[in-house]
């Protein structure tokens, strides 16, 4: 299948660019929640960035996004899934998410956390994720893979 994007393994040298991407991609949600602080967003990303489980999304050889899968005993967490706002709204996010889930599929369910009210919720619901529970901090909502019943932590 021809696709307009590709993936390459992330490296430690990608960290600064990725921190800036997160700040750009997350700004609307963080502003809406009254939590926008560019320096904090960068630090939070850099504090949790692990290149070994992260792929850079490229279009025409240029980096436009990132996605990571963190494996735990009972679930695989989709993390740091950000696309440059300039390439959002083209269906690329759905394609990438399905591709990455297929590549990592095993017996564990996929999970992810999003900010309450995030526009990204539509993307995840299109792919089949369902709301499981709110994490109690008033911001994050936890979503599970298709067919997973709502639960509590």
Regions found by a protein language model. Give the residues of each.
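A short beta-loop-alpha structural element at the N-terminal edge
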Residues: 5-20
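Conserved GNAT-fold acetyl-CoA-binding loop/helix
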Residues: 26-46
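A short helix-loop-beta-strand connector motif used in the catalytic cores of GNAT acetyltransferases and
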Residues: 46-56, 65
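Hydrophobic adenine-recognition pocket in adenosine-nucleotide-binding enzymes
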Residues: 10, 81-83, 114
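Conserved beta-strand in the GNAT
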Residues: 62-71, 77-82
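Conserved beta-strand-loop-alpha-helix junction that forms the acyl-donor binding cleft
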Residues: 88, 111-122, 136-144
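Conserved acetyl-CoA-binding loop-helix of GNAT-fold acetyltransferases
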Residues: 83, 89-102, 121-126
């Amino acid at each position: 299948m021809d696709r307009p994007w590709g993936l390459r393994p992330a490296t430690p040298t990608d960290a600064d660019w990725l921190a800036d991407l997160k700040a750009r991609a997350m700004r609307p949600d963080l502003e809406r929640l009254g939590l926008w602080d560019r320096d904090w967003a960068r630090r939070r990303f850099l504090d949790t960035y692990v290149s070994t489980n992260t792929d850079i999304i490229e279009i025409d050889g240029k980096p436009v996004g990132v996605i990571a899968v963190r494996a735990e005993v009972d679930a695989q967490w989709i993390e740091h899934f950000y696309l440059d706002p300039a390439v959002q709204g083209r269906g690329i996010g759905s394609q990438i998410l399905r591709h990455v889930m297929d590549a990592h599929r095993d017996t564990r369910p996929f999970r992810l956390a999003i900010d309450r009210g995030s526009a990204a919720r539509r993307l995840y619901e299109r792919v089949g994720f369902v709301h499981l529970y709110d994490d109690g901090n008033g911001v994050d909502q936890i979503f599970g893979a298709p067919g997973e019943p709502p639960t509590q932590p």
